[in-house]
């Protein structure tokens, strides 16, 4: 049985997090992620659409591999990655646990799969969070499209308004639970987010909705899963993932 850490690096389209179009063959954007996963002796897979064969060969090793994908521009990269993960995981066997993360602003601080909190909770979803509540100005704007598409979205926002804002830049769990969550997340995007023409991707909105309405009873977020978001706690080693 294996544990996996997956990430996706799609270039050639506007990156909403960096406010720019990323260079096609720039390994330095994923280098820290790859090195941190390899240092923990975990299997990491980087899905990409534009790395050269030369760079893939140069930076592949015992732990890190590259998988070329065809990007479908019908969905923003922040959303399309979930379809990539779903389709990849559906084809492989002997997977015990999975985390999926952002790739350019996340590094692994320690192996999450051997932590007592993880091993004792095979039916839990683990994810990042932010030091703010779900009810905030950015999320209200971010969720405009989903709010108009999903009948119960506004009620969910009201119910969980004062709860911590979850961050989909880091999430994972034991495989059966994780894959169930991932399939439901993809279904939400395919059903409600395919016609999104707003300036927001909907990835955070769909993730928080699903985690809170269907997985909230078995949800772990914050320490030790992640450092404080955007606190740039680069020296912390007591959490599983550093996220900015």
Locate predicted features.
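Short catalytic/ligand-binding loop motif for oxyanion handling, primarily in non-cytosolic enzymes
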Residues: 14-16, 53-57, 106-110, 115-117, ...
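PAPS-dependent sulfotransferase catalytic domain
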Residues: 125-170, 204
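A short acidic, often aromatic-flanked loop/helix-cap motif at beta-alpha or helix-coil junctions
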Residues: 71-78, 133-135, 225-231
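Catalytic core and acceptor-binding pocket of nucleotide-sugar-dependent glycosyltransferases
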Residues: 154-244
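A structural signal for short, well-ordered beta-strand segments and their strand-loop junctions
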Residues: 7, 45-48, 97-102, 125-128, ...
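Short, surface-exposed amphipathic charged segments that create phosphate/polyanion-binding patches used
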Residues: 79-88, 139-145, 235-243
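GT-A fold catalytic core of metal-dependent nucleotide-sugar glycosyltransferases
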Residues: 82-140
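N-terminal anchoring/stem segment of glycosyltransferases
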Residues: 1-80, 84-95, 176, 215
């Amino acid at each position: 049985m294996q544990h996996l850490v997956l990430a996706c690096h799609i270039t050639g389209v506007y990156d909403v997090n960096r406010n720019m179009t990323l260079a096609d063959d720039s390994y330095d954007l994923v280098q820290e992620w790859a090195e941190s996963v390899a240092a923990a002796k975990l299997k990491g897979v980087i899905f990409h659409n534009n790395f050269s064969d030369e760079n893939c060969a140069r930076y592949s090793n015992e732990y890190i591999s590259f998988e070329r994908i065809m990007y479908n521009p019908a969905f923003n990269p922040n959303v399309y990655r979930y379809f990539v993960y779903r389709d990849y995981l559906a084809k492989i066997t002997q997977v015990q646990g999975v985390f999926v993360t952002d790739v350019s602003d996340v590094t692994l601080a320690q192996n999450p799969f051997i932590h007592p909190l993880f091993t004792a909770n095979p039916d839990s979803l683990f994810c990042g969070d932010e030091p703010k509540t779900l009810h905030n100005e950015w999320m209200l704007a971010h969720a405009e499209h989903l709010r108009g598409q999903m009948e119960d979205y506004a009620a969910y926002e009201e119910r969980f308004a004062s709860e911590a804002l979850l961050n989909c830049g880091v999430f994972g769990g034991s495989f059966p639970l994780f894959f169930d969550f991932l399939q439901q997340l993809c279904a939400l995007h395919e059903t409600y987010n395919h016609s999104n023409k707003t300036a927001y991707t909907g990835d955070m909105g769909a993730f928080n909705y699903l985690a809170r309405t269907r997985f909230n009873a078995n949800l772990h977020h914050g320490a030790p899963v992640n450092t404080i978001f955007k606190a740039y706690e680069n020296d912390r080693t007591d959490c599983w993932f550093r996220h900015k």
